[in-house]
Amino acid sequence: DDPWFAGWCGVMVNVSDIAAMGGRPVAIVDQVWAPAAECAEVLMSGMRDASECYQVPIVGGHTNYDAFELNLAVSVFGRATALITSFDAEPGDVLIAAVDHRGSYRNSFDNFFAAGGAPAERLRGDLELLPELSEAGLVKAGKDISQSGIVGTALMLAECSSVSITIDLDAIERPDGALLEPWLRSFPSFGFILAVKPDDVAAVVSRFHDRNLAASAIGDITEGSTLHLKSGDETVLFWDYASQPYLNLQSRVPTHA
């Protein structure tokens, strides 16, 4: 429905993945399938625009212009000196959400696009915060907020780290006009959840605020296997990955190539 945006997102989500791990993107490769070359022009334009914006070159890939329909796959290479993992959140940590609210929803999707029309230098500087925080030893674990939204991404972090998380819905900051329920499932173009030691919360939040990015502590990390949502005096169970795995991480030891 929006091939330019699909191409842009192919780059954007990959550079966000690298930032979420405390790294800096180096290069991108892509695979494009289309019925004909002209069918892929708008898609490729979106990729080129994002590549130029984030200054991450597309160095190669594969094209098939004899395919049944338009499809895209993108991979990214990056480097990090201090990793942010999904596996190191611990009981006692605080969950922080950092999101760029300077945007709007793209068409009828749940994609909150804060990169459209934004200065490229600002977007690159915002992403640079993640490796800087990691190299400063201020972030223990984290993930970029994906298509599963804030709650689903927090669930993935909890399961990866074998911890419980309770999210305070009243603490979640939202863009002007955004309702809570759709915001919880939204996929922001810049959004991260981070596990941070209590003593480091103020320092981490201030780094984002210095760049006019919304950031706040939204939850607590404890022992267990659940994700709870609370508002006021009410707390409800959202998911228990011990009884119903979300990612189904049966083994952290690779069993095949």
Question: Regions from the language model: what does each represent?
Answer:
Residues 107-122:
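Short, compositionally biased
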Residues 35, 119-189:
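Active-site-proximal betaalpha loop/short-helix elements
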Residues 203-212:
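Short amphipathic alpha-helices in soluble, non-transmembrane regions
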Residues 1-98, 103, 115, 185-186, ...:
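Glycine-rich phosphate/pyrophosphate-binding loop regions near the starts of catalytic domains
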Residues 30-33, 62-64, 100-101, 145-147, ...:
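Short, ordered loop/turn segments at secondary-structure junctions
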Residues 195-202:
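Helix N-cap motif at beta-to-alpha junctions
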Residues 57-61, 76, 96-98, 141-145, ...:
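General beta-strand structural signal in soluble alpha/beta enzymes
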Residues 211-257:
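Acidic, Ser/Thr/Pro-rich beta/coil linker or hinge segments at domain junctions
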